[in-house]
Amino acid sequence: MSELKPHQPRRSAIRNWARVAAGMVFGLLVAMLVGSVSSALIGAVIGWDIMALCHLALIYWRLATVDEHTLAGRAAEIDQGRRVLTAVFVAAAIASLGAIAVMVRGGHDPAALALASVTILISWLLMHSVFAAHYAHRYFQTGQGLIFPGDTAPRFGEFVYFALTVGMTYQVSDVTTDSQAMRRLVLTHAVIAFGFNTVIIAITVGLVASLI
């Protein structure tokens, strides 16, 4: 297998950022368009949904269909570190709160309930998918941190499985951790997921129950 030239990883990272930026611009345009014919809040929420869906499409398009050798390089391109993880979590939380506000204002409007539910689901899935990409990057970067059952090298689906397990149960299952750094990362993920699930989803369920 031929080695990559030094400039190639940088070009790949630039292309990845260009794709992310294109999704953000598209989302902003949709937000402005919807906001001009509806409320600014609804426009902002729908704009976030478009941005998040574009980023989800990028993650799964680039990572979900490749073997472990290609996955190692692409995960490094997609993952932008803890700052991006933090930014995604904050944006997802704000968008979800905005969706809850839309639901409260809409009262019994089915469209408002549907928009709020879809937004929270998209935000939740994006948060854990970004963590899955980060887990994949850390795993292939260090060669340790996670131990997967079986003899085959993990694909991206295994990292999504691990991220969703942590995000829904706040613990690991048959995939185990074997480094202090990975345990700290898993703990951070579990705490963030617990906070999101407890505050955002609990409020949403309570409001939906009161409106039915």
What are the roles of these predicted feature ranges?
Residues T176-G195:
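Interfacial loop-to-transmembrane junctions
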Residues H55-E68, S129-Q141:
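Membrane-water interface of transmembrane alpha-helices
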Residues L71-A91:
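Juxtamembrane helix-capping/reentrant segments at transmembrane boundaries
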Residues A40-A57:
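Loop-to-helix transition at the N-terminal end of transmembrane alpha-helices
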Residues Y139, Q144-S179:
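Membrane-proximal soluble regions of multi-pass membrane proteins
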Residues A13-S36, I94, N197:
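The first (N-terminal) embedded transmembrane alpha-helix
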Residues Y60-I78, I100-V104:
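Membrane-helix interface/capping segments
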Residues V30-G43, A101-L115, V208-I212:
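Helix-coil boundary and interhelical linker segments in multi-pass alpha-helical membrane proteins
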